[in-house]
Amino acid sequence: MALDCQHLTQTQIATIDSFPVLFIIFEYFFMLRFIQTDYLKEKKSAAILPLLFSGLFMGLSIASKWIGIYAGAGLAILFFTHCFRVIRSASKADADQLRSALRRTLILCLWCILFFILIPVIIYLLSYIPYFAYLSGRITSPTDYIKEVIKAQIGMFNYHSEPGLGMNHPFYSPWWEWPIIGKPMYYASQEYIPAGFTKRNSIFCFGNPVIWYGGLAALAYCLFRFAQTRRYQLEGTDYLWHIRTGSSDFRYSFILIGFLAQYLPWVLVPRGTYIYHYFASLPFIMTAIAVSFDQDDPKYRLYFRLFAAAFAIAAAVFFIILFPYACGLNVCKGWLDIGNHLLRIWYNP
């Protein structure tokens, strides 16, 4: 992530996306901690605490930007999938263990109502206090406050659901262009250039081609490994659909669910979109790259490590080449020209 240009640009100029993306990383981290627990054997706090923090950070991400809701869908899929695995495992033992698994799962679901519904709603309502502080006289009771919050949600939803809005923007970029850096977004450039000044600057929002294109290959590898280790079978003597796996490695499904939860909702957004909307998907792309290089087979381990080192060096080289465009650094025209040839980014001559 440190070598990605979009990450540098978005965080350096402190766009709102920086905060929900950070919270999304934390909420998925704590959901991962929950998935790594066997709540039938371990103490209750081992499962409840990760869920509490995951829900807390989900509330913070939604309060920052609605992309946190997309993450919530991914968390729900991961949670119920893990619960299903536990129940399936218990069903192979005896009736008492199955009843215990169902009872504990139900208790966790009740806790999740607090962690993933009530707490996020409270955080979201409280986040409007600074905004409504300027509406003197319009809010005289908690009921008025809630009505104004609902009114704000309706206004935002109507804005985002207006077909074609913003599609005439010169840097409009549909969702399928983001992974291939189809149209970087222009942010700023130097307009007043003193006489004799030979350096230039410009700021664009775009990704490191090595990381973004490498991430697509890594996602394809994760999908292949996920499909390779799964087979679906209905056992006639059981009421459960058994999802069997030749491996207990759930990293691939975790990455794919997280990525698709952040990326696929943008397919349904009818208004104009831009490349920075891909920002929340980047942590899962980078995780996919790391997982793809993590090989346990000693026969291939050295080769993958060498390839990982070469990949990191290539990413660093491209980051240095494109660095001036990512942060607006004043540099010579020759340096900027390299970025201009690689991507559709430019500067005022």
What are these model-predicted stretches?
Residues 50, 77-87, 91-116, 120-125, ...:
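Transmembrane helical bundles and short interhelical boundary loops of multi-pass, membrane-embedded
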Residues 191-194, 201-245:
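Hydrophobic, aromatic-rich transmembrane alpha-helices
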Residues 46-65, 263:
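Membrane-interface alpha helices of multi-pass inner-membrane proteins
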Residues 6-19, 64-67:
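Short acidic/glycine- and proline-prone juxtamembrane loop motifs at membrane-interface regions
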Residues 1-2, 9, 29, 58, ...:
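Short helix- or helix-capping micro-motifs
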Residues 46-50, 209-212, 234-258, 303-309:
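Membrane-interfacial loop-to-transmembrane alpha-helix junctions, especially the N-terminal start
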Residues 27-50, 79-90:
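Membrane-interface transmembrane helices that cradle and orient dolichyl/undecaprenyl
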Residues 23-35, 57, 73-80, 122, ...:
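Transmembrane alpha-helical segments
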